[in-house]
Design a protein with these regions (language model features):
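N-terminal, polar/Ser/Thr-rich
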Residues: 1-39, 47, 65, 117-124, ...
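Surface-exposed beta-strand/loop patches in extracellular or lumenal glycoproteins
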Residues: 43-61, 142, 151-155, 424, ...
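Hydrophobic alpha-helical and helix-loop surface patches within well-folded domains
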Residues: 178, 208-209, 213-482, 617, ...
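Beta-strand-rich binding/interaction modules
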Residues: 63-70, 438-439, 449-538
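Aromatic/His-enriched, Gly/Pro-containing loop or helix-boundary segments
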Residues: 54, 73-91, 128-135, 276-295
Length: 858
């Protein structure tokens, strides 16, 4: 039985048979305040290529009342099964189907999500349909290449606003009748409804006027910095329309900040939904504003790449996400007046770290993954699909040229507007504009898995001049269990030479760009080139590879990493050091010392915050267990020293306060947290606002210094959805058997928690200082996880499978327990992948711990 799955072969056959014309969808949401179910009436008109053919339409609904095909009533009990409605005896040419059903509101962030704000006790609704969840709201042919027009008619409670892909009409008797959309895929249709707060503006250029809207719940309205959001949006419109040479393809552009959102945002055509944590209630660093801007630009880029032109099947999901990721960073880097021209530093520091991690898991896969069915795609929103793909697009731009790249993209949009494509369509357009044959490039980069390592091999003469510089390329074996073979790839890279100037700064003195092919590539050198202090391969981060430094360069970088005048080479060196730590080539204790020696000079706040996270992870997971507490003590003392030394009111001060709160451990340190929380002690310039208070509360709760009553009192100060999440995490973090048992039961033994609260409880439950307390839950996890996977929706089950895996129990016993479960449980491919990825993390941590222990005895 197919259940809720859909195979590629089924989708191909349905696309061969059908051409879908239009949907008319009538939804009665008048009872949304109470919840439960709602009436959904779908009328869909489509053509069949054959007379008498048979197919199906998708629907996930508690009850189906009527199914009528070409005027004939079908027996519901016979045709509705396994989330499908069987459609037999189709006419050649035009057909019309009408389905009347009761669909369910959800609390999982899939389908039509319903949330009640504790501040005003009003219900707020929004849809999330990618990948296969439009069928939870209306009967649909749920695949991206069966595009159609969509006309929504919605009955809603009085006083509500309803937003969809088309411009919002004036309601008549609380009924909102929208105009049909252009031809789009089911997964980018949308409906958002509730008493939302709205701010409106326009984007205007050369006679073009695009209405803009920003929405959030009224309880967040005081924090909504609409002017900043509109400014980023207009920057995106300006840059994308110029680079794509195609006007914005929809009638308006709304951005809706919605609660309990599982992802960062979703590119619904003209009605983008964004997690409302991006409406900042408290002070955040500029890095948070940069991430929000990147999210806004990412979704806006999708209006062209993904919505206007859409992949035929989910194996090209990477192209959607990689292009939007590349475009978001490029816009921030190159748009006139951008606030974040250093965005490629952020990309190297965060997105590529994600990609490198993902690419070294047993689940590594080619960028163009083999997506056999919906189960495959649901676990494929990963670091390869987004970050590696975007890195490779950046490499492609370096390979064909920026102007040639965008000229090809322009031709691609014009040729395929409102249609569906495959990768070959884009590559063909780029081949025409660049003159490059991209077939071999595509095979090496898009159809193989794994990551290359680039090392310099340097020879000098007695006078200190370079006599040769060779780039040595390696293709390490793929992780155990991964499919494919190691592959050497063509790389377009820059080699940077850096020297110390008279003021002790590392400045670039030369840059050589070249194509790297095969195992060894000689770098052409100017005559009499002195050996530079640092030779940096992949300078400017043009390619996707792990980079290693030669011994002399590593020695200089270890002493002067913070002295690079530019942020990108610093980020590349930081990334290399982190990668070496994860690989066991650099001991955790040495990585800690490297960070402590250079972080004070790091001006990029995003890099600083990444280093905070990486050091904490390294000492928690990669340090030899007998040294771990000493390492944590050294790190915590450093965080407090930097907090006290930071400029009052600065981003760095806030970042160090959060780093200190994440790891405070001694009685004196915890007393300081308590005093800062109570206001009996202050640090000049540090505003202990709502979100920082919760960071302190969670650490104090995890340390056993706040009880249930005190957590409840903090929640009374912040009776909001965010406060509810923080309180749930704090309760689960308490170091008692009772707290852990209650948290476990609420997530694993009950399915009542909404997605966001479940996520919070899981994050509170898994405290790295509580390994012994959590040890009994290893056995409980393996006893429960398959049943959870089978019973819950994908999002909820994935949270549990990943979040509650015993990753903190770094031991051979955990590996053995995992292997035994994989052998006996016979999980489906998606669950097997998630558990295998977590197992790989434990295996890596064991190797890193051994390397750290060996360094101590060396």
């Amino acid at each position: 039985m197919p259940g809720t799955n859909l195979t590629r072969e089924e989708a191909q056959e349905r696309a061969r048979l059908l051409t879908v014309d239009a949907y008319e969808i009538d939804l009665d949401l008048s009872g949304a305040q109470e919840g439960g179910t709602y009436r959904s009436v779908t009328t869909v008109r489509f053509d069949s290529a054959e007379d008498g053919a048979e197919t199906f339409i998708d629907l996930v609904a508690p009850a189906v009342h009527d199914v009528e095909l070409n005027g004939k009533a079908l027996d519901v009990a016979s045709v509705f099964r396994d989330s499908r409605i069987a459609l037999k005896h189709l006419r050649a040419g035009a057909n019309e189907l009408k389905v009347v059903a009761d669909c369910a509101y959800t609390n999982t962030g899939e389908g039509l999500h319903r949330f009640v704000d504790p501040v005003d006790e009003q219900a707020y609704l929004y849809t999330q349909f990618e990948v296969p969840d439009a069928r939870r709201v209306f009967a649909s042919f749920e695949q991206p290449d069966l595009k159609a027009t969509f006309r929504f008619t919605v009955k809603a409670p009085a006083g509500w606003t309803v937003i969809s892909n088309s411009p919002t009409p004036e309601p008549v008797d609380d009924v909102w009748s929208f105009e049909p959309t252009p031809r789009i895929s089911t997964y980018i249709t949308a409906l958002i409804a509730g008493p939302y707060h709205a701010v409106h503006s326009t984007y205007e250029k050369d006679g073009q006027v695009v209405p803009l809207g920003i929405y959030c719940r009224p309880s967040l309205a005081e924090y909504l910095d609409a002017d900043d959001i509109f400014a980023v949006t207009r920057q995106g419109f300006e840059w994308f329309q110029e680079k794509f040479d195609y006007p914005y393809p929809f009638a308006k552009y709304d951005q809706l900040f919605v609660p309990e959102f599982n992802a960062g945002a979703m590119e619904n055509a003209g009605a983008v939904t964004i997690r409302d944590q991006y409406v900042f209630r408290s002070k955040v660093t500029d890095a948070s504003y940069e991430v929000r801007a990147a999210t806004i630009l990412h979704e806006l880029a999708h209006m062209w790449f993904g919505d206007l032109v859409t992949m035929e099947w989910w194996n090209d999901l990477w192209l959607n996400e990689s292009f939007a990721t590349f475009a978001e960073v490029a816009c921030q880097a190159y748009a006139e007046g951008s606030r974040w021209p250093h965005s490629w530093t952020t990309f190297a520091n965060s997105m590529k770290t994600w990609a490198y991690r993902q690419d070294q898991l047993p689940s590594t896969h080619p960028i163009m993954a083999d997506i056999r069915d919906l189960d495959d795609v649901l676990v494929n929103f990963d670091g390869i699909t987004y970050a590696k793909g975007a890195s490779v697009l950046k490499q492609l731009v370096a390979y064909v040229g920026m102007d040639e790249f965008f000229t090809g993209v322009q031709a691609y949009f014009k040729a395929h507007a409102y249609g569906n494509t495959r990768l070959a369509d884009l590559l063909g357009a780029l081949e025409k504009t660049s003159g490059r044959d991209l077939k071999a490039w595509s095979k090496a980069w898009l159809e193989t898995a794994g990551i290359n390592v680039l090392r310099p091999e340097i020879e000098t003469d007695g006078a200190g001049h370079l006599t040769s510089l060779t780039v040595v390329q390696e293709a390490p074996a793929l992780p155990a269990g991964a499919k494919g073979e190691p592959t050497l790839r063509p790389h377009r890279i820059a080699v940077g030479f850096y020297d110390l100037d008279g003021e002790g700064h590392l400045v670039r003195t030369n840059r050589i760009e070249l194509d790297v092919e095969g195992e060894r590539t000689a770098v052409p050198l100017p005559a009499d080139t002195a050996r530079p202090a640092v030779v940096l391969l992949n300078d400017d981060d043009l390619s996707y590879a792990k980079v290693r430094l030669d011994e002399d360069s590593l020695r200089v970088v270890t002493e002067h990493l913070g002295d690079f005048t530019e942020s990108l080479p610093r980020a590349l060196c930081w990334a290399s050091a982190w990668d070496m730590t994860r690989d066991g080539e650099l001991a955790t204790r040495d990585y800690l010392e490297l960070v402590l020696s250079g972080i004070a000079k790091e001006s990029d706040i995003g890099v600083v915050q990444s280093l905070h996270r990486q050091v904490k992870l390294a000492v928690d997971q990669y340090a030899a267990p007998e040294w771990r507490e000493a390492g944590l003590t050294r790190w915590t003392e450093a965080t407090l020293a930097h907090l006290r030394a930071a400029e009052p009111g600065s981003d760095h001060q806030l970042a160090w306060a959060r780093a200190f709160a994440a790891t405070a451990r001694t009685p004196l340190q915890l007393d300081l947290l308590q005093a800062l929380l109570n206001g009996t002690e202050e640090i000049e310039g540090l505003a202990v606002d709502t979100e920082l208070r919760w960071a302190f509360v969670q650490r104090l709760a995890a340390s056993g210094l706040l009880d249930e009553e005190e957590i409840a009192a903090e929640y009374e100060r912040d009776r909001t959805a965010a406060g509810e999440r923080h309180a749930a995490a704090a309760r689960a973090a308490q170091p008692s058997e009772a707290a852990k048992a209650e948290a476990w039961a609420s997530v694993v033994e009950s399915d009542k928690l909404p997605n966001s609260l479940q996520e919070s409880v899981i994050s509170g439950f898994t405290q790295s200082d509580q390994r012994e307390l959590l040890a009994p839950y290893t056995e409980k996890f393996f006893a429960a996880v398959k049943d959870v996977w089978d019973a819950r929706s994908h999002e909820m089950a994935q949270q549990i499978a990943v979040g509650l895996y015993p990753a903190l129990q770094v031991s051979q016993a955990t590996l053995d327990a995992t292997d035994a479960w994989l052998e006996s449980a016979r999980p489906n491919a998606a669950l097997r992948r998630l558990i295998s990825e977590s197992r790989s993390g434990v295996e890596r941590a064991l190797r890193a711990q051994a390397a750290d222990a060996a360094a101590a005895s060396a």
